[in-house]
Amino acid sequence: MIVKRDKSIVICGSYE
């Protein structure tokens, strides 16, 4: 799951 949040990429609830 890739979600763009706060200009950051959140993958599986982890910040990449």
From Swiss-Prot:
Induction: Identified when cells are grown in rich medium (at protein level). This is Protein YoeJ. It comes from Escherichia coli (strain K12).
